[in-house]
Amino acid sequence: MQKIIEINGSNLTIEDVVAVARYGAKVKLDEKQKDKILESRKYVEEALSNKMPIYGINTGFGKFENVPISEEELELLQKNLIYSDACGVGEAFDTEIVRAMMILRANAISKGFSGVMIETVECLLNMLNAGVHPIVRSKGSVGSSGDLCPLAHMVLPMIGEGEAEYKGEILSGKEAMKKAGVSTITLKAKEGLALINGTQAMMGNAVLAVYDAEKLLKQADIVASLSIDALGGIIDAFDERIHLIRPHKGQIYSAENLRKLLKGSKRTTRQGEKRMQDAYSLRCTPQVHGASRLAFDYVKQTVETEINSVTDNPLIFPGENGACISGGNFHGQPIAIAMDTLGILMSEIANISERRIEKLVNPALSHGLPAFLVKNGGINDGFMIPQYVAAALVSENKVLAHPASVDSIPTSANQEDHVSMGTIGARKARTIVDHAQHVVSIELLCAAQAADFWDSKNLGVGTKEAYRTLREKVDFMENDVIFYPLMDKSFEIIKSAILLANVEKIIGLLK
């Protein structure tokens, strides 16, 4: 029986979000949160009855903050906010991103500081459970005040507007909700603002990118070890003593992984046996992979914190000394910097992987392997062009790794005079992770092919399992074949993290 993810604004994890977004896990609201949601809603209604002026509830938005809104127009104000802000451009986000946005926004407003109705939280959860996925255009957010534009597209079907995907068909929002049996809602005072003034579009991208990146970091060690094994690499460079006197945690862990993976190899060598030192792409694998791991720890911690944060404005603090306070929790800068960091650290994983690919295919560098890892070179091109593909991907990553978070263009007539560009950063980071997965999967193909030119039986205990995992899907390439299906199969092994799962079954958990 599939686990049901219960949301309460405090305990949602990266794995929970992925379970809902990618694998369709069901969701429900923690019953204990209902009183907190009701309490914050009660504060809003009492403030309105007392004619208290509150930003975005009975005033305009942004530069219109000082324009009062009459009681009769409060619901119209919220509807107009969604209408006007739903102006995104570009391709629609993938369904898994939209689902991540939905669960993350529901989680944030369920915490009890947003002043929404319980029915509003449950509408998002019911849509997730029924498979109603708003069509959310991917471009148009500057990352402060939150992700207004994409989240407005997310809200449209909730009020019977916009478009949504349901059972593979693009329908009007109203029709999708009706077919799925999910009731639409009427936005009450503050609710439109509470739904769109948050960081959940950048976070939808961020959570999935972080999840995939974490799997890739360990698999990069696995694939690198197979390349090192196939090339007869010098294992002295991974000696524990070297890494303990430069005690960066990521470097120590990566070196430990390599030793564990290469244990029992009859292909690896010792310094001085055949050569004194290996090229940096082999010898410095722990230092490069380790630096990315260390930076990743910061990225993951930031994203984990944001998952259970309240990021709208103004915020309701109900109770005896209740207050509604305007602040800046919608500002995406924490995620913007983290996503730029993720893009950079993943670019480096791909960069060094591509250099190992070059070492495997280049006969001047491969210590006895045939040119481009193929018999009868000339009539066969072998693995020549996959290296081009890897080079193209790492080159594109270098452009994408330019930080978005250092840019800011003022908006709303300079009222919102510093913005994060965090959603741009998160979209870029997700693309870079995808590219890095492809590059590492190309290295896996090359390393396994290289191993077969010697004797795969001589591989280490971990590298042998990595080799076997690929060979279950992809055979040794005797002569040129249509290549992209092989690359697709190798990519799926990396994307699904089956490589990691299989290797860890044999040698135990990697660091």
Curated annotation (Swiss-Prot):
GO molecular function: histidine ammonia-lyase activity
Post-translational modification, as annotated: Contains an active site 4-methylidene-imidazol-5-one (MIO), which is formed autocatalytically by cyclization and dehydration of residues Ser-Ser-Gly.
Modified residues annotated as 2,3-didehydroalanine (Ser) in this record: S145
Covalent link (5-imidazolinone (Ser-Gly)) residue numbers: S144-G146
The enzyme's E.C. designation: 4.3.1.3
Chief site of localization: cytoplasm
Catalytic activity: L-histidine = trans-urocanate + NH4(+)
Cytoplasm found in the keyword field: yes
Compartments reported by the entry: Cytoplasm
Pathway the protein acts in: Amino-acid degradation; L-histidine degradation into L-glutamate; N-formimidoyl-L-glutamate from L-histidine: step 1/3
GO cellular component: cytoplasm
Keywords on record: Cytoplasm, Histidine metabolism, Lyase
GO BP, one annotated term: L-histidine catabolic process to glutamate and formate
Keyword Ribonucleoprotein: no
HAMAP family: His_ammonia_lyase (MF_00229)
Family affiliation: Belongs to the PAL/histidase family.
NCBIfam families for this protein: hutH, PRK09367.1
Stated name of the protein: Histidine ammonia-lyase 2
Lineage: Bacteria, Fusobacteriati, Fusobacteriota, Fusobacteriia, Fusobacteriales
The encoding gene: hutH2
